[in-house]
Design a protein with these regions (language model features):
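A short, flexible loop at the N-terminus of ABC-type nucleotide-binding domains that lies
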Residues: 1-6, 10-22
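The feature captures the beta-strand-to-loop junction immediately N-terminal to the Walker
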Residues: 36-38
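Helix-to-loop junction immediately C-terminal to a conserved catalytic motif
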Residues: 51
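Conserved ABC ATPase "signature" region
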Residues: 90, 94, 101-119
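Conserved ABC ATPase signature
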Residues: 123-130
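Catalytic Walker B motif of ABC-type/P-loop ATPase nucleotide-binding domains
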Residues: 148-152
Length: 236
């Protein structure tokens, strides 16, 4: 089942300065779709378009189920200066109309998983970048939406944090959620994504599972990195 269908003819922050062209894809239940490309390729702009945050867009973003909820986990943590970690979680639960019992259970489980339980009454603005990234992951996964939109989740995460994130990804996929994740960490993406959308200068240069990407790049046994470089060379 499609959780979101994206058809962007063009898009940008100004109508006269378009960044995206001919972007079409879907994210299905149980999928982890990797939005792959270098810095400045348009990955974050695509995510903003999916969420309706791009000032100009010619196209359509369709959520087939009108009741589909999504969680957005940004690359840069967004935190309140005067709220403790626990108060951040309480605020998110209140916005999501989560019962107190469900909130406490999920919050404590995630805090323990990411080894932040002892820090729950501290101010996250004083945390390291990696710890702040874990806070954003906890906030997103606590809500258990049907769709996760994740922007560069690996930046700042230590190996334990990355393992915990990947464990949660597997769990929510098994529960039927879909994930759209942007990253330029091709080695990790190759291991965990079910399909890929390769972006260059705001345009899709290839998409599909790894086998399809290999066929399109004419590298039958190539890594995702090698395939991406080959496709870029074909564009030039």
């Amino acid at each position: 089942m499609n959780l979101v269908q994206v058809n962007i003819k063009s898009g940008g922050y100004l109508k006269k300065d378009l960044i995206l062209n001919d972007i079409s894809f879907a994210v299905k239940s149980g999928e982890l779709v990797g939005l792959i490309g270098p810095n400045g390729a348009g990955k974050s702009t695509i995510l903003k378009t999916v969420m309706g945050q791009l000032p100009y867009m010619d196209g359509k973003i369709d959520f087939p189920n009108a009741h589909t909820h999504y969680a957005y986990i940004p690359e840069q943590p967004v935190l309140y200066d005067n709220l403790t970690l626990w108060e951040h979680l309480e605020f998110a639960a209140a916005v999501g109309k989560m019962s107190r019992e469900t909130f406490v259970s999920r919050a404590e489980e995630l805090l323990k998983l990411f080894r932040l339980y002892k820090e729950k009454h501290r101010l996250p603005v004083t945390f390291s970048k990696g710890m702040q990234q874990k806070v954003m992951l906890i906030l997103g996964f606590m809500m258990r939406p049907a769709l996760y939109i994740v922007d560069e989740p690996f930046i700042g995460l230590d190996p334990h944090g990355m393992r915990d994130f990947l464990q949660l990804v597997d769990q929510v996929r098994q529960d039927g959620a879909g994930i759209l994740m942007s990253t330029h960490s091709l080695d990790t993406a190759e291991k965990i994504c079910t399909s890929f959308i390769l972006i260059h200068e705001g345009t899709i240069i290839s998409q599909g599972n790894l086998e399809a990407i290999r066929q399109q790049s004419r590298l039958p046994e190539g890594s995702l990195f090698d395939c991406f470089i080959s496709l870029l060379e074909m564009q030039s």
